[in-house]
Amino acid sequence: MKILVIGGPTAIGKSDLACCVAQKLNGEIISADSMAVYKFMDIGTAKPLECMKKVPHHLIDVVEPGGYFDAKIFEEMAKEKIEEIKRKGKVPIVVGGTYLYIQALLYGIDETPKPDWNLRNKLYEIARKKGNDYLYEKLKAIDPKYAKKIHKNDLRRIVRALEVFINTGKPFSSFHSWNKPKMDFVGIYLKRSPESLYKRIENRVYDMVKDGLLEEVKKLLEMGYENFLTSGQAIDYKEFVPCAKGEKSLEECIKEAIKNTKKQAKRQIRWFRKQGWHEIDLDKLSIEEACEEVVRIYKDANKTK
């Protein structure tokens, strides 16, 4: 049985479609979202809370905010879940926009060195004194391939890549096998026109604020998670920290969140477009029609294995 992978940019409609597909295929969903792994962060990560009542979901609420979780850990945990789901006679459906996680699962990551906390803390201290850009430029010089794949403010990933290079002399990208897939899978890429997607992103940010995102950010700050919330990774959270602290207006924070989410979507689109997966245009099909099409593609692929 092949696994089904449904990917695409943020706010495209992955969760709604995956929920429909999972019910029709008797599947279970494995989330490939680098923010959904964190507990207490429901609104800003758009966790599919309604669908979670109907379909079993995995790799959501795994660690506390700021807890260590990377693509290698995701690969190992996702593989375990895939085997567990298959043993039940159900279809494993991987859903998300974090392409580094999807890439790790499908193509594998060689064993990377264990964390060196002393070195890591020194690198964080350098970033505190000299800024994220300073470390990002260092990473670009030693590992341009990996630097291209991550955001210049994603300090956690920058520090990890530098840490590995300093300890091994090898670029972090050399631990990734990006040639032949190690898993038998059917890939579905969801797309929309830029105008349509950007409108959905704008609406989603406003909806999240309406649903209580600012209150969620305030609660997380009270719990002591400010360092994580202001990291480059925490899109739709970091933008609202100044607002929660009374340093910016709500409208300013909303505009910043929309701008950063659109940038993230562009990076995701660039990666998914290159994969050669089956493309589903959600501007032309309703969720129900797209669901039927994905089910057909998946069943046909399993007939010809």
UniProtKB/Swiss-Prot annotation:
One of its GO terms (molecular function) is tRNA dimethylallyltransferase activity. It catalyses: adenosine(37) in tRNA + dimethylallyl diphosphate = N(6)-dimethylallyladenosine(37) in tRNA + diphosphate. The record marks 98, 120 as: Interaction with substrate tRNA. Substrate binds at residues 10-15. SUPFAM superfamilies: P-loop containing nucleoside triphosphate hydrolases. Residues 33-36 are annotated as: Interaction with substrate tRNA. Its cofactor is Mg(2+). Keywords: ATP-binding, Magnesium, Nucleotide-binding, Transferase, tRNA processing. GO terms for biological process: tRNA modification. The keyword ATP-binding applies. ATP binds at residues 8-15. Catalyzes the transfer of a dimethylallyl group onto the adenine at position 37 in tRNAs that read codons beginning with uridine, leading to the formation of N6-(dimethylallyl)adenosine (i(6)A). PANTHER family: TRNA DIMETHYLALLYLTRANSFERASE. Belongs to the IPP transferase family. This is tRNA dimethylallyltransferase.
